[in-house]
Amino acid sequence: MGGLQPWHWVIVIAVFVLLFGAKKLPDAARSLGKSMRIFKSEIKEMQSEGKSDNPPATPITSERVDTNPTAEQPDKRSA
């Protein structure tokens, strides 16, 4: 009990053959293999990008420009 017996695997395989048909199973396995290869290559690429020697980008500082008219500037509406 608790573990899968060999006859459990036979039943699982029989259900897959009945659901998908014998012709579609090789294509499904092939596409699953391709997907796994692509996934693994993307994971390796992401890990290599994380270990790059580039220093972290410095934040860009900017000055704030006040767009409200001040008392020093004459009001254009009253002229």
Swiss-Prot record:
GO MF annotation, one: protein transmembrane transporter activity
Main location: membrane
Gene3D superfamilies: 1.20.5.3310
Keywords per UniProt: Cell membrane, Membrane, Protein transport, Translocation, Transmembrane, Transmembrane helix, Transport
Keyword Coiled coil: no
GO biological process assignments: protein transport by the Tat complex
Region annotated Disordered, chain positions: 43-79
GO terms for cellular component: TAT protein transport complex
Keyword Transmembrane among UniProt keywords: yes
Transmembrane segments: 1-21
Compositionally biased tracts (Basic and acidic residues): 43-52
Entries under Pfam families matching the protein: TatA_B_E
Membrane topology, from the record: Single-pass membrane protein
Top-level lineage group: Bacteria
Cited function: Part of the twin-arginine translocation (Tat) system that transports large folded proteins containing a characteristic twin-arginine motif in their signal peptide across membranes. TatA could form the protein-conducting channel of the Tat system.
HAMAP family in UniProt: TatA_E
Subunit-structure text: The Tat system comprises two distinct complexes: a TatABC complex, containing multiple copies of TatA, TatB and TatC subunits, and a separate TatA complex, containing only TatA subunits. Substrates initially bind to the TatABC complex, which probably triggers association of the separate TatA complex to form the active translocon.
Family label: Belongs to the TatA/E family.
Protein name per Swiss-Prot or TrEMBL: Sec-independent protein translocase protein TatA
